[in-house]
From Swiss-Prot:
Residues 53-69 are annotated as: Framework-2. Residues 45-52 are annotated as: Complementarity-determining-1. SMART domains: IGv. It is found in: Secreted; Cell membrane. This is Probable non-functional immunoglobulin heavy variable 3-38. Residues 36-116 form the Ig-like domain. The gene is IGHV3-38. Residues 76-113 are annotated as: Framework-3. It comes from Homo sapiens (Human). GO terms for cellular component: extracellular region; immunoglobulin complex; plasma membrane. GO terms for biological process: immunoglobulin mediated immune response. Residues 1-19 form the signal peptide.
Amino acid sequence: MQFVLSWVFLVGILKGVQCEVQLVESGGGLVQPRGSLRLSCAASGFTVSSNEMSWIRQAPGKGLEWVSSISGGSTYYADSRKGRFTISRDNSKNTLYLQMNNLRAEGTAVYYCARY
């Protein structure tokens, strides 16, 4: 059985500022159960390292669910993701990552990166 991890891109405009904030995600796809994927979220218009960044997901027919966050040197995970998911960032590329290992069919969802 295979399942799909989808991705989208989110675009936001800062109110009253002529600066576009953009998050462009990539890396989703079809994967076998127990397989691995790495999602990427390239940011522009702000600095990833200066903000709390998170990954959230939405499974089919379900609401939004927090997955993981990174702030400064600290990382946080939903209990169900600990040990399987790793959030990280590359400051030189201004990019956020989510490494997902030992994926399960119930992991099928749209994954979003978000800035807080």
